[in-house]
């Protein structure tokens, strides 16, 4: 048994079988990918890795299985069948992230069939080939369970609540959020009132779903509000988005040299991590000169000029606004970023798909009295000339 100390959860135990996976090079690669990408350019202490986050998710996932079974009086055999798979799904769920995480997917790859969740599924198969199968792992369902818990691609397990613990596509209440909504603010230096313990301990299994006590409706809303606030004010901070735009331009310019799209589909993907930034920055290769110049601008804080931030509805509306307002700037020098800030359920209440215990009548459900989604646009001049 190995114990790893985590700043959020204390000592996390891994048995001998789990340690084989924990020590795999694909998992260790997560140490070379920052959890919050370029956020450290604005919040310097936000430099933690996806490895730390994945440890936390695996811990909460295992604990959640125990609590659900205890609260619901389910037989112990469920524990051995699902506990390992859920814990490993938590550990593996971010394996497919590329350099600087979402920038790599959203700007460079732009292919839903090769997104980080799908890459995580492929990497899980590679890891099991390398680690091999012991008696404990010999069942055919293990690999399939873990992959579907990370990112479901079939309807085979839609009615199995254990597949909603790591990635909950039904109502977005999952252990991925439970960890990063605690971990990220600690590293950024923000106070955060969100604690998932009450939600976890007031969760139950009912048929094919995880349901919750009505007494935690305010805690659930707090989770969605905290996520909304972090996305709007921190993760999508105007300077962070600007630097992400510049990094995206640098990576796209370097794509012919690194061939990101093809490499991301092969085992060579293991070599792609955040070190790509320093590789380009320190390179004398002429093929990377444009990319290097963009990164030098980031380093020297010679950033693209922000022209406008506001709400939008349609692309055509944005383009018309740009054409009418910035006639003195070359069309090729103007770029814009669109963002949606919501509570995980589009324009509707995040509680719409959350099921509560029906035999509780003494608690009123707490909801958000606000607009659930906001569409924003940021417009930039990449040449910094007017």
Give names to the regions the model predicted.
Residues 1-87, 95-386:
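Histidine-centered, transition-metal-coordinating active-site segments
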